[in-house]
């Protein structure tokens, strides 16, 4: 999102009595707890709601605002930092700059992710499994999916049937196969993650046996010391992650439906291709797939009001 996305809309605030003449049901306003609301919440007498989903992960925080047609009207991502509470406050301020003031608007907000309990202004906190499933079904327009979410500190495999979570596996006790693992390995190679992925396309014939981030880093350092070409080491790092994810998928019961990739790596074409090859089935993705959890949270907000 560019800087212009957060320019104030200069929306004025009006009282309930001032908007009754527009044809808006005043009882509806009182039901959602509004004494004063933004004037641009109304268009030709039609009451407009914003539905906000906030997904505070261990590495990044994603925010999505949906309108009543379930269309994305705002989305932004930022580093979580060391304090989820501070991140939640920063998100609140960004929403205000985007013209969405939760203290005045008849909006509904749901938080999810690692830091979901750190969002004091959220109407509800919902688990990330539920939100990622809702978001994926909405993004890919398919009721049957197997979601592969590679996050900063964990990897989730979620099996969805007819729009509902059937089963899931979550690797949250070890950073192996996660975004953090890849980040550490890229730093060891003095590369940015995207540079490492592109370099990995050129490599082959090298493996990293350890699934532990600490031991894997030692292996990488050892390979560097032996003069192994950097592209081969990059290949080994990515291959290690792909094998870890595939092992998680193999633990799921039943036949796997369409695979979709969500999380921060959703736009990495090499990761998607490597997963497709390893799983023997195409893995689909979308540029908005990193917002799957936040989209699911916003959809959950629609069920509250």
Tell what function each PLM region has.
Residues 134, 179-183, 286-305:
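Glycine-rich phosphate-binding/hydrolytic loop that grips phosphoryl groups
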Residues 84, 162-208, 212, 299:
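Glycine-rich phosphate-binding loop plus the immediately following alpha-helix
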Residues 216-251, 290:
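Adenine-nucleotide phosphate-binding core of ATP-dependent small-molecule kinases
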Residues 74-80, 98-130, 140, 166:
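Short beta-strand-loop/turn "lid" adjacent to the catalytic site in phosphate-handling enzymes
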Residues 128-188, 285:
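Glycine-rich phosphate-binding loop of actin/hexokinase-like ATP-binding domains
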Residues 92-107, 245-257:
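Phosphate/pyrophosphate-binding loops at sites that engage ATP/ADP/AMP, CoA/4′-phosphopantetheine
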Residues 114, 249-278, 289-293:
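Glycine-rich phosphate-binding loops at beta-strand->alpha-helix junctions
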Residues 51-90, 165-174:
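Short glycine-rich, Thr/Ser-proximal phosphate-binding strand/loop in the N-terminal lobe
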């Amino acid at each position: 999102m560019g800087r212009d996305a957060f320019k104030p809309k200069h929306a004025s605030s009006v009282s309930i009595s001032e908007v009754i003449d527009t044809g808006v049901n005043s009882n509806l306003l009182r039901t959602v707890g509004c004494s004063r609301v933004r004037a641009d919440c109304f268009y030709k007498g039609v009451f407009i709601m914003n539905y906000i989903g906030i997904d505070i992960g261990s590495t990044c925080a994603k925010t999505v605002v949906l309108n009543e047609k379930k269309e994305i009207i705002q989305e932004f991502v930022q580093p979580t930092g060391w304090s989820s509470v501070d991140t939640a406050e920063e998100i609140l301020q960004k929403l205000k700059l985007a013209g969405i003031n939760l203290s005045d608007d008849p909006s509904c907000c749901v938080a999810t992710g690692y830091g979901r309990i750190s969002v004091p202004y959220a109407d509800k906190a919902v688990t990330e499994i539920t939100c990622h499933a809702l978001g994926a079904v909405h993004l890919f327009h398919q009721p049957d999916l197997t979601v592969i979410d590679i996050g900063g500190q964990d990897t989730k495999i979620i099996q969805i049937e007819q729009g509902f979570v059937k089963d899931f596996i979550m690797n949250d006790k070890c950073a192996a196969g996660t975004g953090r693992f890849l980040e550490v390995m890229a730093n060891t190679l003095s590369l940015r993650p995207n540079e490492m992925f592109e370099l990995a396309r050129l490599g082959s014939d090298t493996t990293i046996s350890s699934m532990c981030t600490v031991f894997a880093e030692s292996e990488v350092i050892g390979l560097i010391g032996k003069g192994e070409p950097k592209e081969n080491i990059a290949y080994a790092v990515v291959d290690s992650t792909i094998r870890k994810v595939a092992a998680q998928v193999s633990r799921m019961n039943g036949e796997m439906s369409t695979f979709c990739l969500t999380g921060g790596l959703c736009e990495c074409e090499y990761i998607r291709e490597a997963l497709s090859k390893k799983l023997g089935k195409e893995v689909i993705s979308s540029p908005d797939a990193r917002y799957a959890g936040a989209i699911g949270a916003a959809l959950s907000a629609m069920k509250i009001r």
